[in-house]
Amino acid sequence: MKVIFLKDVKGKGKKGETKNVADGYANNFLIKNGYAVEANNAALSTLSAQKKKEDKLAAEELAEAKALKEKMENLTVELKAKSGEGGRLFGSITSKQIAQALEKTHGIKIDKRKMDLPEAIRALGHTKVPVKLHHEVTATLDVHVSEE
């Protein structure tokens, strides 16, 4: 029997896939538990419409991420911190502080987990921070730490 998977089933298929499986397995397990539906014309047309909709949404998200990247590449986030001799900070600047400053000064809300800051900033000056906006788009944000 040909079925369309509604959920991922380990070893059998992923969501949205169309596959042939044994009739008993399809009727007694997959369809009964809501993991799949029988692949008839109506279900196939619904699946194709849903895939088109998902593709369109993914393209829109990618376009938004690219536009945000263009905007962020030209920005500088200014942060002030207390420092000692040689430009070393007392404490450090974290991705959370950068995200808050970005939202406060430029109105761009970015999740702190999207900032790829390997370790906190501990010195004065400019630092380039990569920000993963989308799995295909990474922007570079300029962070300037000056003395308070």
Swiss-Prot record:
GO terms for biological process: translation. Keywords: Ribonucleoprotein, Ribosomal protein, RNA-binding, rRNA-binding. The keyword Zinc does not apply. InterPro entries: Ribosomal_bL9, Ribosomal_bL9/RNase_H1_N, Ribosomal_bL9_bac/chp, Ribosomal_bL9_C, Ribosomal_bL9_C_sf, Ribosomal_bL9_N, Ribosomal_bL9_N_sf. The keyword rRNA-binding applies. One of its GO terms (cellular component) is ribonucleoprotein complex. One of its GO terms (molecular function) is structural constituent of ribosome. Belongs to the bacterial ribosomal protein bL9 family. Binds to the 23S rRNA. This is Large ribosomal subunit protein bL9. It comes from Listeria monocytogenes serotype 4a (strain HCC23). The lineage of its organism: Bacteria, Bacillati, Bacillota, Bacilli, Bacillales.
